[in-house]
Amino acid sequence: MQLTVTNDVNGEVYGPLELSGDMMLMDLVALLEVDCAFESGKQQLYFNGKELKPDVEKTLEELGIGNDDLIVIRGQPVSSNSIANSTSAIELDDDAYVEQFRLQLLSNSALRNSLRMPFADIDSLVNDPQQFKTHMGPVIIQRRRMQSAMPTNPYGIPDEEYKKLMTNPEDPEHKKRLQELQDKQLIDEQLRNALEYTPEVFAQVSMLYINMEINGHPVKAFVDSGAQMTIISPRLAEKTELKRFIDNRFIGEARGVGTGKILGRVHQVQVKIETQFIPCSFVVLDSNVDLLLGLDMLKRHQACIDLEKNVLRIAGTETKFLGEAEIPKGTSFDAVGNPQPPVEIKESADHSKKKMKTSFTITPKVKPVKADNLLNNSSPMGNTGRTFPEKTIKQLMDLGFSRQEVIQALVSTNGNAEFAASLLFQ
């Protein structure tokens, strides 16, 4: 059978080790001490969450250990007995340590067989102390040096720091440090589990793009329900013959993760998705994303992003999301793989002497008012006879609307200037 051994103390993974099912557990422990930096007095073995006692006289099969299973080495609190045992082991010089290991191999055929692959002549070596010391001594001594240099505490930190922490574990600073170490162990365990059971979460996810047409020009549109507005870049507006329809009165600044310059707005254009023509409006933003289909158009046409079928349903039609190979290259994304759409849009009119910045981060829930009603209403106060601050009326008029339109919008929104501005721009 093949076993994999992970050592939580030094963070190493060993294996797969080729072993026999009738191998005794104590023989496995001896092998792990040589090959996997396991110290029986200071560390513990775990299989399926249960501790394996090294002194149990059972075979691996009897313990339920099978092919491709995992053995975990974990540290344990240092006791006075273990310190005494480790001290006596360190007192052995290198030659005595090598000879002790040779004698152990002589009396343990299973352990000797496990070393047959790296040392084909292991039988002759163990019977000749001098040859064993010459050929295997350097390897055994190197392993011993590595084990002695490794931290012996369960957190894998320098032993001096561990002893300092454990002298007064209730000290607030010590308690904070111990909690950090425990959290790190938990994070490392979660990472190992994620790599083993859900490795797909570490793969890059393709963003959602669809094919559409603007004035007969094929375009790949990025679908982003997290973006507030639908955006088109100046170069794509020029390519699709929309540049002459850009309303320059709506220049401003878009603020999100970064900032972008708004060059204007295209109020209405017919875009084609599959066989369906859909009215759409664009904010012209100097961005690396040529076309971004934002929440305004998705909500307007009652779109549904169906990830199970990998399609976008919008305005009675259905179109497939593009595969990774079809997605435009060179699009700007942030560190977590998301684009940087504007979150707040501030618009102003060029001809105004005093620009009013209007935030569209809140969508007003007001009853739509027909343009005919706005234009034909002769009463400057509306039907309610309410009056509004002259300063508010002037600010909204500076955006390019008549006094009657402004007052009617304020009446419809109960005097809320931001909602009134949003209503006027519809």
Curated annotation (Swiss-Prot):
Organism of this sequence: Candida glabrata (strain ATCC 2001 / BCRC 20586 / JCM 3761 / NBRC 0622 / NRRL Y-65 / CBS 138)
Q: Which SUPFAM superfamilies match?
A: Acid proteases, UBA-like, Ubiquitin-like
Task: Say yes or no: keyword Signal present.
Answer: no
Q: Name one Pfam family in it.
A: Asp_protease
| Protein name stated in the entry | DNA damage-inducible protein 1
GO cellular component annotations of the record: cytoplasm; plasma membrane
Question: Cross-referenced PROSITE patterns, in alphabetical order?
Answer: UBA, UBIQUITIN_2
Q: Which residues cross the membrane?
A: none
One annotated GO molecular function is: proteasome regulatory particle binding
The record's Gene Ontology biological-process terms are: positive regulation of DNA replication; protein secretion; protein transport to vacuole involved in ubiquitin-dependent protein catabolic process via the multivesicular body sorting pathway
Q: Which family does it belong to?
A: Belongs to the DDI1 family.
